């Protein structure tokens, strides 16, 4: 049997035989990947070998930046980069969505393809509650959950799953804001929840926000959802704002820098 065993490699095993082999799982942090390991990860995803990489990402990209271009440069989306390899299974999930994460990791470990799981984790050192960080990033589309499985079908829609993201048929999810009116009466208002709303949870990002008294409101100030849907020319004459609830429960208008929007 020596000659036969010498020629045997893992590609000669059947699917049932491969299922008996313990999966190879690599655990890494996003900082190390972006710090010089991106090329190695790309090479691994092209090998065709059933090696599974789990990356813990505690950078939601919601921190302060000087321009939108700087934001993109400091926080590339690892999950989207991995999808470009086409033949790899890619999971992007969050500790805030444990059911999605559990199911996705199960698919990952059973796959005979190279795979990557990007798991959003809170920045534990920040003063904001970790789960508020994660929920805000998820609702603000900063860390959307998805699963790309090339074996799920022959079309993009069959291979790409976007559950359990909130209100996936809308640009932004809508939430009900509860606050106090001018006379202290309870009021409710439906608002979209955008990337900028999520960034407000991060103390470092609040330097791009200013709360205005009603006397400073003007027609040039527009809700951020309307601002984002404007063409470039009219947008340049407007200032985006969001509604925030003050410590006393009062609803206040907060304008944003254009980079923040």
Segments predicted by a language model, with ranges:
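Flexible, low-complexity linker and terminal segments
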Residues: 123-261
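Core active-site phosphate/anionic-ligand binding loop and the adjoining beta-turn-alpha structural block
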Residues: 51, 55-160
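Cofactor-binding active-site loop characterized by glycine-rich and histidine/acidic residues
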Residues: 1-52, 61, 72-85
